[in-house]
């Protein structure tokens, strides 16, 4: 058995996100599964899974994943909340998106707050 260093995990996460960008969702899912196994404490992997689902036009699945698994593991994570709000907005559920976006805006993650503010004000 082996472990991944933090740098190796970052590299794999970047490769997974590159695969998402090239619509290679199965490859990305495999890489993210490996990362999730070896770095289960990293919310960035959960965020990347949500991004992959949304990039595959599976916004409902992204919301279900965020609600059912990701937020259970990382309660109140601002970036997960921001992406939940984005997915709900893309699904035409703006009223439902408001609560997670406002929570992301109040969080300590500046990037999540910027995303949330853009969606709330856009």
How would you name each of these model-derived features?
Residues 25, 59-60, 94:
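TPR-repeat structural position
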Residues 18, 52-53, 87:
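Residue-level signature for tetratricopeptide repeat
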Residues 74, 89-111:
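TPR/TPR-like (Sel1-like) alpha-helical repeat modules
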């Amino acid at each position: 058995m082996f472990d991944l260093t933090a740098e190796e995990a970052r590299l794999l996460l970047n490769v997974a996100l590159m695969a998402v960008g090239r619509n290679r969702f199965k490859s990305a899912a495999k890489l993210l599964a490996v990362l999730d196994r070896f770095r289960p404490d990293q919310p960035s992997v959960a965020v990347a899974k949500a991004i992959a689902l949304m990039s595959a036009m599976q916004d409902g699945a992204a919301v279900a994943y965020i609600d059912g698994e990701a937020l259970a593991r990382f309660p109140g994570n601002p970036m997960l909340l921001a992406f939940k709000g984005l997915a709900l907005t893309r699904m035409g559920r703006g009223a439902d998106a408001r609560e997670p976006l406002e929570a992301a805006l109040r969080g300590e993650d500046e990037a999540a707050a910027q995303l949330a503010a853009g969606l709330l004000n856009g």
